[in-house]
A protein has these predicted regions:
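Active-site segment flanking the S-adenosylmethionine/decSAM binding pocket
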Residues: 142-185
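Glycine-rich SAM-binding Motif I of class I
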Residues: 75-79
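Conserved class I S-adenosyl-L-methionine
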Residues: 64-73
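Extreme N-terminal basic, low-complexity initiation segments
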Residues: 2-5
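Hydrophobic/aromatic beta-strand patches that form the interior of the parallel beta-sheet core
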Residues: 68, 95-97, 146-148
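S-adenosyl-L-methionine
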Residues: 109-157
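Rossmann-like AdoMet
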Residues: 12-65, 82-116
Length: 185
């Protein structure tokens, strides 16, 4: 494991470690909360099972879709959605919300592109990770990304999603994100 300290945007220092999950993909572990960013069984496996198989796959090939991710985290779900969009000729407008963005340096230490066998998409991955927050980024002709540095409970835009990736930490560590008011919003 690589031990890295980063300063969160709330000015509280939080330790983060890069770990390997069972499918070989890396993830981030927060010792203070005893919580992983992804399933210990596999970061990539989880993303495909939860967000693609049970979300994006419900839309027909060639569709135009607005995706809202609550918990942008490492950007893995965004990258996998991009890869699926290319494969299925989808037009995606992707909005990612993140209250505590990870440092780009740490994200580039993750092995997601290798594990996805998508090294040819390095430029796209870099663009996803380094695009400015609060601005629309044209990742490709059919994939737009807006990253917003905002807490879930402070996001109040209506009509911005056909599909929501709710990728919050579990209720054990963030019970405030698992309330009825969050889901009504």
């Amino acid at each position: 494991s690589i031990l890295i300290f980063y300063l969160c945007s709330d000015s509280n220092q939080m330790e983060r470690k890069i770990i390997q999950t069972s499918d070989g993909s890396s993830s981030v572990y927060l010792p203070e909360w005893d919580e992983n960013y992804h399933s210990k069984h596999g970061a990539i496996q989880e993303a495909y099972h939860v967000f693609i198989k049970n979300g994006l796959d419900l839309f027909q090939d060639g569709s135009a879709i607005q995706v809202l991710e609550m918990g942008f985290g490492t950007g893995l779900n965004c990258m996998i959605t991009y890869l699926e969009a290319i494969r299925r000729d989808l037009k995606i407008d992707y909005t990612g919300l993140e209250g505590y963005p990870l440092e780009t340096k740490m994200i580039f230490e993750l092995n997601h592109l290798e594990q996805l066998k998508a090294q040819q998409e390095l430029e796209v991955y870099q663009n996803i990770q380094t695009s400015d927050w609060e601005k629309l980024a044209k990742i490709s002709s059919k994939f737009n990304l807006t990253k917003k540095g905002i807490m879930f409970e402070d996001f109040h835009e209506n009509g911005v999603a056909d599909l929501i990736y709710f990728d919050a930490f579990g209720a054990r560590v963030q019970p405030e994100l698992w309330t009825e008011s969050i889901f009504k919003n």
